[in-house]
Regions:
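Residue-level detector of functionally pivotal "anchor" positions at catalytic/ligand-binding pockets or at interdomain
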Residues: 420-438, 443
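A recurrent domain-boundary module in secreted/ectodomain proteins
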Residues: 409-425
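Short, surface-exposed loop/turn motifs with a glycine/proline- and acidic-biased composition
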Residues: 444-479
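Boundary at the C-terminal end of the N-terminal hydrophobic targeting segment
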Residues: 17-26
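Structural signature of tandem-repeat unit edges
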Residues: 33-36, 46-68, 75-91, 100-117, ...
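C-terminal tail/sorting-segment detector
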Residues: 1-3, 425, 469-485
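Sec-dependent N-terminal signal peptides
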Residues: 4-15
Length: 485
């Protein structure tokens, strides 16, 4: 389908050249007499080889400044190998350099002028081809933005593969969206405190970037700002930040710890999803909502404290947090959304707050280690039949003493192996290892009082016998005497 669309565009695009387009030295232009400006446009015969766009052209004795490159101007010019763009160009239209597969050299003479170009999209920038970027015939690797620059436009350096370091001077106040996205060899960047705005996806896929200090004055970590910066190990977030946007740190797999300032009140969808190296993060007390998939697949996150002020956990917020051991859901939460703790395979204990009224499908599925669920709600929450799975047959449910009968009467709660009052402290849970079979539990006088099936070489024995009672546990042919403390 993509090939058919590309073929169709290749046929149609030459037809959209304006009737008054003129050819001057092999380049086609749309001329605007009223402003004496010229726009580079489509060549019906396609551009090939090395193209040098001049700063001005003359037609019928009138000089025109070349200020823009029109949409699709070099679209599908597969034999275009080099492009030189003058300082006079201030705008490049949509898809201007799409499918320029052989474009290996992009040449400019002024970084400040380049920073001010308005790019309509990623493929309006010739750097999207992956070619080398030259400033006055020298390949750009260590970039220093000139002091006279106050704003770096969106897409300005996207996909600049040669870029290894960037120094931004005081005086720059904004960095546009996607400005440095896909700069795969960028290892360091210095951002001054004068910067108060950094656009969405500005550093997406900068997978060699190891550390970054976000300047004071930034209030929002925007959507996708550091998505898939897989080498990022350190990020400093200033106290001015109040919001962590959607996918802000998605896929930052080398990030081990993050300190969020106290002023943060919102953590967006997938904000830290797939941060597989993250071991700890402190959520500020002012946060009221954790977005969908906010910590999904943070596979090394062993513990996390959800503040009391949180009232909403999004779908799959902690899905796949396979190292998480315990979780306490605060009383302000009323709904456990779909898959919120699914595939938390090390989770042994979960406390559900007293205000929870609804527990949706897969909330705790594939949590095979979950041994104790503490549900503080006196009114049995409306619970999907598949909120839990078969492990609850071996798990203890702890509920308010006045609600035990109600939980026993409702699915899926009644499927728990044991439902006990929260204030019953006589419950003892003991683990014994055994390769196969099951464990038999006998009273001291030899009466069989229970069994426990062995799963994954471990069996869980539950009793609520009075303190001081002795029992005998048989594992195969061996007997072990134990006492309830």
């Amino acid at each position: 389908m993509k090939k058919h669309i590309l073929s169709l565009l290749s046929v149609l695009l030459p037809m959209v050249v304006f009737a008054d387009a003129v050819e001057i030295d092999g380049i086609y232009y749309n001329l605007v007499p009223s402003t004496k400006e010229a726009e580079v446009t489509i060549n019906p015969n396609v551009y090939t080889g090395d193209v040098v766009i001049p700063a001005s052209v003359t037609c019928d004795g009138v000089d025109f400044s070349v200020t823009s490159i029109g949409s699709y101007s070099f679209f599908n010019c597969k034999s275009l190998t080099s492009i030189s763009i003058p300082n006079s160009v201030t705008k490049i239209g949509d898809m201007a350099f799409s499918y320029c597969n052989s474009l290996s050299s992009i040449r400019i003479s002024d970084i400040a002028a380049w920073c001010s170009i308005i790019f309509s999209g990623m493929e309006s920038n010739p750097l999207s081809s992956g070619g080398k970027f030259y400033l006055n015939d020298e390949e750009i690797k260590d970039l220093t933005i000139p002091n006279r620059v106050t704003s770096i436009g969106q897409f300005a350096f996207t996909n600049c593969k040669s870029l290894s370091s960037v120094t931004i001077p005081d005086g720059v106040t904004s960095i546009g969206g996607n400005t440095f996205s896909y700069c795969s060899n960028l290892t360091s960047i210095t951002i001054p405190n004068s910067v108060t705005s950094i656009g969405q996806f500005a550093f997406t896929d900068c997978n060699s970037l190891t550390s970054v200090i976000i300047p004071d004055g930034i209030t929002i970590i925007e959507f996708g700002l550091f998505t898939r910066c897989s080498s990022l190990t350190s990020v400093t977030i200033p106290n001015s930040v109040t919001k962590i946007g959607d996918s802000a740190f998605y896929g930052c797999s080398s990030l081990t710890t993050v300190t969020l300032p106290d002023g943060v009140s919102s953590i967006g969808k997938s904000a830290f999803s797939n941060c597989s190296g993250l071991t700890s993060i402190a959520i500020p007390d002012g946060v009221s909502e954790l977005g969908e998939m906010a910590f999904m697949y943070c596979s090394n996150l062993a513990s996390i404290k959800i503040p009391d002020g949180v009232t909403k956990l999004g779908e799959s917020t902690f899905h796949g947090c396979s190292s998480l051991i315990t979780i306490v859901i605060p009383n302000g939460v009323t709904v456990l959304e779909y898959g919120v703790f699914s595939q938390c395979r090390s989770l042994t204990s979960a406390t559900i707050g007293g205000s929870v009224k609804t527990i949706k499908k897969n909330s705790f599925t594939d949590c095979p280690a979950l041994a104790d669920v503490y549900c503080l709600a006196e009114n049995v929450p409306s619970t999907d039949l598949y909120a839990f799975d078969s492990y609850i047959l071996q798990a203890i449910l702890h509920v308010p003493s006045n609600a035990v009968d109600a939980y026993m009467a409702q699915e899926p709660w009644r499927f728990f192996q044991c439902i006990v009052p929260l204030d019953d402290e006589s419950i003892e849970t003991t683990y014994y290892t055994s390769p196969t079979g099951h464990i038999d539990i006998y009273s001291i006088d030899g009466k069989l009082i229970g069994t426990a099936a062995v799963q994954s070489e471990a069996a869980r024995i539950i009793n609520n016998l009075p303190s001081g009672t002795s029992t005998i546990v048989k594992k195969g042919g061996k007997s072990v005497k134990i006492m309830v403390k």
